[in-house]
Amino acid sequence: MEKIRLQKFFTDNKIMSRRSAERVIEAGNVKINGITAHLGDKVDPENDRVEYNGKVIRNNTSSKKYIMLNKPLGYVTTTSDEKGRDTVLSLVSDVGERVYPVGRLDMYSEGLLILTNDGELTNRLTHPKNNLPKVYSVIIRGEVSPDALHMLNSPMEIDGYKLKPVKVRVVSNTNGNTNTLFTLNEGRNRQKSETRPDSGWYRRSSGCRRKRNRKP
């Protein structure tokens, strides 16, 4: 969201007048993200943490939007694309509020993607310390042997970084294919491509949010 002057943040949220806001800022009673604010400072109302006398001021100037999108194949998970490819935002252009994707799905992966303008939720879902899992339905061509399943569940290393083990569970075998569930605790780039033995990916859940069989 576009940044605004700190005084305007106070007046927009009906906390105090502009002049009163200037006085409390000059007195050192206001902090932005834990740092004492000064006159002229600007804030992002959706993502910055503003405190007045030790109390967090919540932004109530815009409504929060939460979208659970069944992302189809062929869309990139960005707000814009320099190559001119279709982005996921083109699928929600009628929302009326600016939203952005939480995390990402590869262009040729499909399934649950959360879009929101809630910065706090985005941080909770994406910060590594929260260790929220992502579950994918993966169709593997052919049958998966016990040895292959053991290998898939073993730790791997990408670019010198040791990843947490992927949990893989066989759900069923259909028409010569193996239907599995992959649970990833890290979104490390290339982890899926290094893990999958020629398969299609469909993300069913992200953190505590589960996607059921919904159309895009």
Enumerate the predicted regions with their spans:
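Basic, flexible Lys/Arg- and Gly-enriched helix-loop patches that mediate nucleic-acid binding at interfaces
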Residues: 1-216
